[in-house]
Amino acid sequence: MRLRNIPGAQDAILESPYVVQEPQIKKGHWGEVFVKKQPLHIEVGMGKGRFLMDLARLHPDINYIGIEMYDSVLLRALQKREELEENGEVYSNLFFMRVDARLLPEIFEKGEVDKIYLNFSDPWPKARHAKRRLTSREFLARYDQILVQDGKVEFKLSLIHI
């Protein structure tokens, strides 16, 4: 996906009721963010958010947080959610965050996340960029710091030679 600077994206994100601002403050208290205290699943690098919006609709008994680090991409997810809500779909079990995934242990306590989704993340194919991959040892260690005892990381890749 080609990233473009979208004027007003940052302001729209800051003003959105669907985006958790200052997520570090919520550490250990994510159950209070949602209407109901339920298992928490996150998607790291959610893109335009379609996958999570579908899950949130199909599984109202699970809370979801979509994590994206690029304003322009997160804005598209917000616009899609607003469009769906205008058409009568309610997502009280879904929020978004604009944050770098390297900060996950500063945002979630150990045992706060039940499942992590990684869908078609940037493969960073060059060897010198291996640490940037969301499936690198460094990132897997971060996930371990926030998952419940038997938590899961589910990922889909488009490049099988990594």
Question: Where do the model's predicted regions map?
Answer:
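S-adenosyl-L-methionine
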Residues: 1-40, 50-57, 81-110
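Class I SAM-dependent methyltransferase "Motif I" SAM/SAH-binding loop
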Residues: 44-47
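Conserved SAM/SAH-binding beta-strand->alpha-helix loop
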Residues: 70
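A short acidic, Gly/Pro-enriched loop at the edge of an enzyme's catalytic core
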Residues: 106-115, 120
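A short glycine-rich, Lys/Arg-flanked "PGG" loop and its adjoining helix->strand segment in the class I
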Residues: 135-149
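Conserved small/polar residues in nucleotide/adenosyl-binding loops
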Residues: 161-162
